[in-house]
Amino acid sequence: MAEYLASIFGTEKDKVNCSFYFKIGVCRHGDRCSRLHNKPTFSQTIVLLNLYRNPQNTAQTADGSHCHVSDVEVQEHYDSFFEEVFTELQEKYGEIEEMNVCDNLGDHLVGNVYVKFRREEDGERAVAELSNRWFNGQAVHGELSPVTDFRESCCRQYEMGECTRGGFCNFMHLRPISQNLQRQLYGRGPRRRSPPRFHTGHHPRERNHRCSPDHWHGRF
């Protein structure tokens, strides 16, 4: 029996433990889930919840109407966000093996940033220290994640352009970075530093919002 239970742990056949939490590190039911969310006490991977804000979903003019943002502008904004977070975390906490950002729309996945460090102790230290940080006008909420193999977490249909669930799919829709940035970060090439958007200890002062790149970046 013990061998059987071990073999189905974290799968759909497991009626005790939540398979979605095991694979993705979050669950749309949250604390109301009828199955257990076994939070790891150590892991190489951390998740920074709802950290990325897609300007196509959030950009507004002063009167509150939606502001059109082109695909090119969105990619530039995303690459800048990705580079800043990747560089900040790697320089402060240790070598990063992989970083992924969800482009889903569901509350439990939207803007989640998953960072897999080479060493478990680096992930633990990052979670402890980031809990007192602010980024882009919001408090950073980080936790250790059970996700280690993102192939099990990603929506295969989305990768083939065939997902019928759209942004509310419960598997990860990962937003890619540009090829140049991919080579720059993972090829360990030279990086340019941008002004930091991480802040420590207190809520940054609000500014008037405009429909502009500075608004999307949340510079304070």
Curated annotation (Swiss-Prot):
The keyword Methyltransferase does not apply. A zinc finger (C3H1-type) spans 12-40, 149-176. Residues 209-220 have a biased composition (Basic and acidic residues). The modification N-acetylalanine is found at A2. Residues 185-220 are annotated as: Disordered. GO terms for biological process: mRNA splicing, via spliceosome. PROSITE patterns: RRM, ZF_C3H1. SMART domains: RRM_1, ZnF_C3H1. Isoform 2 is widely expressed. Isoform 3 is highly expressed in heart, brain and lung, lower expressed in thymus and much lower expressed in peripheral blood leukocytes. Keywords: Acetylation, Cytoplasm, Metal-binding, mRNA processing, mRNA splicing, Nucleus, Repeat, RNA-binding, Spliceosome, Zinc, Zinc-finger. This is Splicing factor U2AF 26 kDa subunit. It comes from Homo sapiens (Human). The gene is U2AF1L4.
